[in-house]
Design a protein with these regions (language model features):
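Double-stranded RNA-binding/processing signature
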Residues: 1-196
Length: 198
């Protein structure tokens, strides 16, 4: 069964941020997980995710630069990493209801792919990439102003803990060793689980 993007829900989501779109091509691509793409012989969201990740990182960096004038560079990077990471992005994605827009293959759907942070994170970045290509940077900023920036302003970082960075910092403070990351399982040729080794 070939499932199409829920355009009605997409428009309802965008309306909350005072955003309107006329073209859906980029959003169909953005919501097409590799499992869906493989089943239907279409392109997946991997390339547009790359773009969305860059747009998100740049706009958050600019927000931090403009709103935290006395923060040194290292702490600016740490602050950005707290609010632009898989855990945080998955929370933003759920608030946006991107999990309901996702196009997944049958196997991924049955294995609970709609609830997996890694998949939802990728879809969130892809969504931002699609919005950037469709409407430009200003509309991406409109979404982030309501969805992401308030968390940074409130500094409610307990909600968004970047466990990978915490582990790295602990290891570096306690030992001279460095962590090595290795993929331990795969789904549709993409790393699904990663182990950290000393």
């Amino acid at each position: 069964v070939f499932i199409m993007l829920n355009k009605k829900l997409l428009n309802e989501i965008l309306a909350k941020y005072d955003v309107k779109i006329k073209k859906y091509d980029h959003f169909i691509l953005a919501m097409s997980h590799s499992s869906y793409a493989n089943e239907h012989n279409v392109s997946s969201n991997e390339r547009i995710e790359f773009l969305g990740d860059a747009v998100l990182g740049m706009l958050v960096a600019r927000y931090i630069y403009e709103n935290f004038p006395f923060l040194p560079e290292g702490k600016m990077s740490k602050l950005r990493a707290t609010y632009v990471c898989e855990n945080a992005n998955a929370k933003y994605a759920k608030e946006l209801q991107i999990d309901k827009l996702l196009l997944l293959g049958r196997g991924e759907e049955l294995s609970g792919g709609r609830q997996k942070d890694a998949i939802i994170n990728d879809a969130f970045e892809s969504f931002l990439g699609a919005l950037y290509l469709t409407n430009g940077l200003d509309d991406v900023k409109k979404v982030l102003e309501k969805l992401v920036f308030p968390h940074i302003k409130a500094n409610d970082q307990i909600e968004f803990i970047d466990y990978k960075s915490l582990l790295q910092e602990y290891v570096q403070s306690e030992t001279r060793a460095s962590l090595v990351y290795k993929a331990v399982s795969y789904t549709h040729l993409r790393a699904h689980e990663t182990g950290a080794y000393l």
